Design a protein with these regions (language model features):
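Short Pro-Gly-centered beta-turn/loop motif in secreted/extracellular proteins
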Residues: 69-77
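Tight coil/turn sites that cap or link beta-strands
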Residues: 63-65
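Primarily secretory-pathway and cell-envelope proteins
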Residues: 1-58, 83-146
Length: 146
């Protein structure tokens, strides 16, 4: 029978590396979206189209207290969703504990003209002077990753 160290190894939550793409269908553009996760939980951020909000076009894992820039986003309008939680389950493509689901209320509009392209910065944590509003969504409303 193993000691306490063996028990602790077994119950360590599973975490992917920041920047791990779970879905990557938005290649070929110039747009950029920097996402800062200043919260104490890991996140999976998802971009989907307003026409088909339940179908993820991009999904990337961002660890707690970390940030990541998604590059190469093609022109279009997208909704930004995110799930927060602990202990990622790669089979079910979801967090197993403390899971919450949210969506930014404003759509993101990416446009490229000549050498100019759209960049956004989104913070998942509240910031002083921040203008973006989020709203909770149910697991059923959240884009599926399976």
């Amino acid at each position: 029978i193993g000691g306490l160290e063996d028990v602790l190894k077994v119950i360590q939550p599973v975490r992917l590396s920041t920047g791990t793409f779970i879905v990557k269908k938005l290649r070929g553009g110039s747009g950029e979206l920097t996402i800062e996760n200043g919260l104490g939980l890991d996140a999976v951020t998802i971009l989907s189209s307003p026409e088909e909000p339940k179908i993820p076009l991009s999904a990337v894992y961002i660890r707690a207290k970390d940030s990541y820039t998604i590059r190469g986003i093609k022109d279009g309008t997208y909704i930004l969703y995110y799930a927060l939680g602990e202990d990622w389950d790669s089979c079910s493509q979801t967090f197993t504990t403390e899971t919450t689901y949210k969506r930014f209320e404003n759509e993101l509009h990416f446009r490229t003209t000549g050498s100019t392209y759209t960049t956004y910065k989104a913070t998942l944590h509240p910031v002083i002077g921040g203008t973006a509003e989020t709203e909770p969504v149910s697991e059923d409303e959240f884009p599926g990753l399976d």
